[in-house]
């Protein structure tokens, strides 16, 4: 462990996923804390003004639902938790919409499940939507879709969701705001000798031994889930900060490089992590052959693959599948995530994007494989 806090990580981060827990957005379980949410939105607006992109992952739906339904304690029955989530999600979305608009920002509600991110096509659709929202200057507010998936309530948590979203959008950093000042060497509520861990590697096995214990009765995650979330986020190159959410101007100060909380540093660079994931960990579902001009652009300019440069399409693949890209000699030169299924790819092969709507009945991405989802293999 080191106490040399690498503040440059957050200072230089341009795309940030911020996760706030139930204890920070509710009045001790008695509905949403309007003042607290307003403060988060004010800080987010300052980050956006500083040319940063921010995605919120917010807990609080079940707690708000409990308040609206008049329940004093968190229920244990799945259907009651689902009902509370459904009722509370209305208030949560309305509160963020109001407070973000007061700060000059648009908002969008996005409800996800782990299944959405496990399916390649839905993963790519969710990614495209979120990146479009960020490009439009809108702040996505994400929560798990607890109402429709039983095991999300039983075993899921928004710390994990925050990490998955960081992977999804290739965020530079994940900020987990909680009711603790960070990770301590032991539980500070039980051990007076416990000290704050200022910085560590996200994959350090000693971290899990330090974490442990459960959270409050309002949320589902304890410190261990935050450590595991940081480890998951590091898979796509995102470092994680775990910090006390009641720290004044926490988000703004972190973005300025202040040493707050615990920094868990990713050991893999963002681009390297994604390229490795595409190149090594997904089974090829098909291939496309490209002409000499497309080959030159892919190799020499790092361009996206456009359908007009394709000569043939082989195999049966879906949107989001990994496909090989071959030159005219049949040699694989790259691979990447397909934006179009094989049936559609055959229709737009050798065609400019201006004809896609006429050929397919809709207009989507102009690229067959976007350069962000493409890795050269030769």
UniProtKB/Swiss-Prot annotation:
Binding-site residues, ATP: 19, 178-179
GO CC aspect terms: cytosol
Function summary: Catalyzes the transfer of a phosphate group to glutamate to form L-glutamate 5-phosphate.
Alphabetized UniProt keyword annotations: Amino-acid biosynthesis, ATP-binding, Cytoplasm, Kinase, Nucleotide-binding, Proline biosynthesis, Transferase
Pathway: Amino-acid biosynthesis; L-proline biosynthesis; L-glutamate 5-semialdehyde from L-glutamate: step 1/2
Subcellular location: Cytoplasm
Chain residues that bind substrate: 59, 146, 158
Entry's Gene Ontology molecular function annotations: ATP binding; glutamate 5-kinase activity; RNA binding
Family statement: Belongs to the glutamate 5-kinase family.
InterPro entries: AceGlu_kinase-like_sf, Asp/Glu/Uridylate_kinase, G5K_ProB, Glu/AcGlu_kinase, Glu_5kinase, Glu_5kinase/COase_Synthase, Glutamate_5-kinase_CS, PUA
GO terms, biological process: L-proline biosynthetic process
Domain of life per record: Bacteria
Protein name stated in the entry: Glutamate 5-kinase
NCBIfam families (UniProt xref): proB
Disulfide bond annotation, renumbered to this chain: none
């Amino acid at each position: 462990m080191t106490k040399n806090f690498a503040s440059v990580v957050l200072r230089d981060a341009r795309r940030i996923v911020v996760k706030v827990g139930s204890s920070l957005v509710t009045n001790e379980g008695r509905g949403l804390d309007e003042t607290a949410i307003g403060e988060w939105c004010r800080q987010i607006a300052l980050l956006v003004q500083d040319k940063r992109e921010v995605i919120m992952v917010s807990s609080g739906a079940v707690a708000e639902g409990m308040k609206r339904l008049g329940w004093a304690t968190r229920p244990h029955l799945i259907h009651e938790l689902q009902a509370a989530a459904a009722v509370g999600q209305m208030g949560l979305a309305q509160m963020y919409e109001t407070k973000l608009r007061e700060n000059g920002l648009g908002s969008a509600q996005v409800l996800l499940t782990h299944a959405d991110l496990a399916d390649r096509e839905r993963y790519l659709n969710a990614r495209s939507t979120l990146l479009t929202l960020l490009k439009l200057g809108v702040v996505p507010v994400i929560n798990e879709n607890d109402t429709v998936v039983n095991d999300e309530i039983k075993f899921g948590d928004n710390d994990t969701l925050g990490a998955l979203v960081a992977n999804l959008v290739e965020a530079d950093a994940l900020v987990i705001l909680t009711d603790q000042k960070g990770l301590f060497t032991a539980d500070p509520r039980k051990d007076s000798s416990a000290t704050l861990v200022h910085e560590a590697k996200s994959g350090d096995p000693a971290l899990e031994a330090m974490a442990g214990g459960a959270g409050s009765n309002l949320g589902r995650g304890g410190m261990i889930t935050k450590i595991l979330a940081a480890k998951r986020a590091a898979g796509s190159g995102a470092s994680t900060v775990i910090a006390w959410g009641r720290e004044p101007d926490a988000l703004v100060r972190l973005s300025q490089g202040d040493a707050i909380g615990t920094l868990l540093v990713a050991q893999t660079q963002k681009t390297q992590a994604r390229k490795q994931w595409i190149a090594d960990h997904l089974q090829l579902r098909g291939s496309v052959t490209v002409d000499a001009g497309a080959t030159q652009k892919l190799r020499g300019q790092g361009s996206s693959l456009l359908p007009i440069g394709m000569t043939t399409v082989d195999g049966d693949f879906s949107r989001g599948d990994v496909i090989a890209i071959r030159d005219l000699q049949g040699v694989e030169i790259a691979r990447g995530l397909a934006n179009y299924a094989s049936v559609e790819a055959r229709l737009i092969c050798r065609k400019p994007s201006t004809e896609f709507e006429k050929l397919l009945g809709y207009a989507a991405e102009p690229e067959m494989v976007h350069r962000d989802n493409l890795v050269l293999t030769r």
